[in-house]
Every structure is written in structure tokens, then in C-alpha cells.
Amino acid sequence: MTILKVMLMAVLAFSALTGSLFTPAFAAAPAKYKKELSAVATAYAPGPHDNGKWGNLTHIGTQVRPGIIAVDPRVIPLKSKVYIEFPDGTGKYAVAEDTGGAIKGNRIDIAMWTVAEAYKFGMQDVKVYVVE
């Protein structure tokens, strides 16, 4: 196998794990969307520390991973694709696959790989665009 093929496979594997290839932090806000709302965003990680007895699973039974958010399904329906715009002007796409006891109204919880990443994210005021 050539070095180029090995490097390409490594990049694709990393991107698949992190979702970074498909949800870049610099993605543009959607031109068309179903709903726009201001929300408070926090972050969480898989495992009992942040996700309690559900561990690594979301409300719909998928794995907690970057690219997933927890929502109040009365505000953002489960399985919706959303675009999240952060205070610094960057944004990313995510899918609503989880819920949470503290996630009520205009709040979202963004999945991260680690608890340290979730703590670093903190709490931010964001704009959320429901795309599909």
C-alpha cells in the first residue's frame, strides 16, 4: 500500500469517528430552514458520568458521538437535522437523536467525545436552524 493510500485511510477513519469531515466547524448557515430559534447550548459525553444509566446510547438507541445533540422533542423533533451557529460565527450541522432530563424548551446538549471537551465547551448562547 502506498503512503498516500495509508494517509487517506487514516484521514477517512478519523473523520468517520469525529464527524469532522461531514460537519466542519466553518460550515455555512443554511439558506433554507424550517425553524430558527435562539437556544442555550451545553455539552455532554458518552458514559455514566454525563449520560447516566443510558451510558453510550441516545434516546433513539444510537451511539452518543459528535454530530449528535439532545433536544426537547416538543421544540426540535427527534431525528431533525439542525445547523448550530456559535457566538464566534462558526457553526456545524448535527442530528437530534437524544433527549435529557434538563433539556427543556430552547436548550440543546451537544455530544462530545470526552467529559473534558464537554466542560471546555461550557454553556453558550447559540442559534439553531432546523433544516429537516
Model features per residue range: what roles?
Residues T2-M9, G19-L21, A25-E132:
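Solvent-exposed, well-ordered loop and adjacent helix/strand elements within mature globular domains
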